[in-house]
A protein has these predicted regions:
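Hydrophobic ligand-binding cavity/cleft-lining segments
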Residues: 21
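Conserved active-site tyrosine of GNAT-family acetyltransferases
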Residues: 26, 30-31, 94, 119-122
Length: 163
């Protein structure tokens, strides 16, 4: 029998771990380009690092071989989703060190404004701002198949601003 959330200890954080091909290159990217700080590097030679930005931790681990670096792939699935206070500020901050925004900004039907960047190992990072209090601009179309028992329903959503 599963324990209820009232009988479990409270979760306090989640910390992604990215397996990377070149630890120093990844540290440089996340610090210089994405604003992470305080890299705590471990190992001799270095093989692990812990970075932080605004209380959000990120772990980087050096791959023993290149085939162990496994981003979610080119399908557009994110490896990390970061909620930010102001996406316009993030876009401006990313432009300064010359980061290319791979996708966005895009207003999504679930009330988030998102941009995507790709790190040197191909990990796709989505930075997003809650826009639930704003009118939607053109939104991305979302489609999929909803399996409801024996029936399958094809669902296509496209939301646009009424303005």
């Amino acid at each position: 029998m599963p324990l209820s959330s009232q009988t479990r200890t409270r979760l306090r954080a989640t910390t992604p771990l990215l397996v990377v091909a070149n630890l120093q290159r990844s540290i440089d990217f996340y610090v210089a380009k994405l604003g992470f700080v305080d890299p705590s590097v471990h190992g001799d030679p270095p093989c692990f690092a812990m970075l932080n930005r605004d209380g959000f931790d990120l772990m980087l681990s050096l791959a023993e071989s290149p085939d162990l670096v496994r981003p979610n792939g080119p399908s557009g699935v994110w490896d990390i989703y970061l909620s930010v206070a102001d996406i316009a500020d993030e876009i401006a901050a990313l432009a300064a060190p010359g980061i290319t925004i791979d996708k966005g900004p895009t207003d999504m039907f679930y009330q988030m404004r998102e941009i995507e960047v790709i790190d040197p190992d191909g990990y796709r990072l989505c930075l997003a701002q809650d826009i639930s209090g704003e009118p939607l601009r053109d939104c991305e179309t979302m489609s999929g198949v909803l399996d409801i028992g024996s029936a399958k329903l094809r669902l296509v959503l496209q939301l646009k601003s009424l303005h």
